[in-house]
Amino acid sequence: MAGPESDAQYQFTGIKKYFNSYTLTGRMNCVLATYGSIALIVLYFKLRSKKTPAVKAT
């Protein structure tokens, strides 16, 4: 058999239905969740407030 397996072949329930390594949709959701979490971490560190030092060195 050439090509991806059909989604009807696997009967997943719960979170495994959306995040698995057997179906194309499951793999896509894993990739999107990974990229999304990396983007959120980058945005958090870019946008967090920069604290000014208590004593400025002159």
UniProtKB/Swiss-Prot annotation:
Protein name: ATP synthase F(0) complex subunit k, mitochondrial
Alphabetical GO biological process terms: proton motive force-driven ATP synthesis
InterPro entries: ATPMK
One GO cellular component, as annotated: mitochondrial inner membrane
UniProt keyword Disulfide bond, yes or no: no
Membrane-crossing residue ranges in chain numbering: 23-45
Compartments (UniProt record): Mitochondrion membrane
Pathological condition linked to this protein in its record: Mitochondrial complex V deficiency, nuclear type 6: An autosomal recessive mitochondrial disorder characterized by gross motor developmental delay manifesting in the first years of life, and subsequent episodic developmental regression. The episodes are associated with metabolic stress, including fever, illness, and general anesthesia. Patients develop gait difficulties or loss of ambulation, as well as other variable abnormalities, including abnormal movements, hemiplegia, and persistent lethargy.
Species, as recorded: Homo sapiens
Gene name of the record: ATP5MK
Chain positions found as N6-acetyllysine: 16-17
A UniProt-annotated Pfam family: ATP_synth_reg
Main location: mitochondrion
Topological category with respect to the lipid bilayer: Single-pass membrane protein
Entry's induction text: Transactivated by SBP1.
Keyword Transmembrane recorded: yes
Function per UniProt: Subunit k, of the mitochondrial membrane ATP synthase complex (F(1)F(0) ATP synthase or Complex V) that produces ATP from ADP in the presence of a proton gradient across the membrane which is generated by electron transport complexes of the respiratory chain. ATP synthase complex consist of a soluble F(1) head domain - the catalytic core - and a membrane F(1) domain - the membrane proton channel. These two domains are linked by a central stalk rotating inside the F(1) region and a stationary peripheral stalk.
Entry keywords, A to Z: Acetylation, Membrane, Mitochondrion, Primary mitochondrial disease, Transmembrane, Transmembrane helix
Assembly information from the UniProt record: Component of the ATP synthase complex composed at least of ATP5F1A/subunit alpha, ATP5F1B/subunit beta, ATP5MC1/subunit c (homooctomer), MT-ATP6/subunit a, MT-ATP8/subunit 8, ATP5ME/subunit e, ATP5MF/subunit f, ATP5MG/subunit g, ATP5MK/subunit k, ATP5MJ/subunit j, ATP5F1C/subunit gamma, ATP5F1D/subunit delta, ATP5F1E/subunit epsilon, ATP5PF/subunit F6, ATP5PB/subunit b, ATP5PD/subunit d, ATP5PO/subunit OSCP.
